[in-house]
């Protein structure tokens, strides 16, 4: 068995050496010296001898074993097997030696081929470099030839253009000479005509001088008649202007008296508004609204309830009503305890008249579904296309409509406006309370400072209802 294992090991080494040789043959670019194959062959033969020696010695030493008689039959059979294996090993060894020689020869050929290939590569690189140089020279020569061709074409074109221009100028020169001869003949003819025209013009000048003198005398007469007519017309216009100025003075007096009555009504309405606001305790309602809003949000938070989005938009910290309350808080309170009214100065007769239409009413006659829906929440609702007017003290359930009140009308201590004022009347005012506006001069408009306000009837009626309910 030991001999069999040794033979198998030697065969495996030979196979490995054969595989190495095949690998070297399969990859011609790998360079390996031939001495390495010889060294491997020597190790292979030494392994065979070492493995075979102990087997034979064991057999020889086995003659002193007690079981020598029983193993004679096995020795004769295994000897034949060993001889066959030795023959196979010798055949494989000779085959391996032949393959080693062939591989050495192929390696020598491969080295020669690699050397020739390196020389060929050097030759190819030098030829490529030379080819590139020749191509660059050829390209330069080709570009030079193209440039010369283009220059030749341009020169031919320039020569043709110069020839055509020369012929054209020659033709024009001949035409100029012929035209000059014609012009000389026309000049002589025109000179004769000019002399005739000068003589006719002298005679016309004398004739028209006489007509101009006659027209000048007629114009002087017309000027005198026109001055007389203008004087009479200006006298009539002056009388008409005096009548108009007198009518304007009467009208301004009536307007001043009507304005005073309107201011008294406005002051009384403002005082009623302030008293009703104080009676309703608007600030207390605001505090109560905030407390109820906080309680509602705390209740929803503790019970883990989700409030509607519309409720948060209306009653949240940044909601619609919170913004309106902030605007109401920022607006300064006004007082109607005193009023400064200066009498209007009488306009001069020379002032110009302007007719101004009375301002329109702000309360709509028809109620749309949006205004009906906003009767509980106030003036406007989020999402409705209605202009928002700042109001003071807006409460849920109380509708506040916008009013036009100038700041100097409620607080005389803040200063009076010098701009032309706009008068606005309430809906339930009498027809005589609507003032008629006329244009004043700059001095009269600077002295006339009047505060004005309007309180819509709907707001006063609703405030009265809230006061009665309270």
From Swiss-Prot:
Function text: RNA-binding protein that binds specific mRNAs including the ASH1 mRNA, coding for a repressor of the HO endonuclease. Part of the mRNA localization machinery that restricts accumulation of certain proteins to the bud and in the daughter cell. Required for the delivery of cortical endoplasmic reticulum into the emerging bud.
Biased composition (Low complexity): 343-352, 438-449
Keyword Endoplasmic reticulum: yes
Compartments where found: Endoplasmic reticulum membrane
Source taxon at top rank: Eukaryota
Family in the record: Belongs to the SHE3 family.
Keywords from the named record: Coiled coil, Endoplasmic reticulum, Membrane, mRNA transport, RNA-binding, Transport
Residues of the signal peptide: none
Pfam families associated with the record: SHE3 (PF17078)
UniProt feature coiled coil, ranges: 82-234
Region span, Disordered: 48-70, 327-378, 430-470
Keyword Membrane: yes
Gene from which the chain derives: SHE3
GO biological process: endoplasmic reticulum inheritance; mRNA transport
Protein name, UniProt field: SWI5-dependent HO expression protein 3
Bilayer disposition of the protein: Peripheral membrane protein
Organism: Eremothecium gossypii (strain ATCC 10895 / CBS 109.51 / FGSC 9923 / NRRL Y-1056)
Main location: endoplasmic reticulum
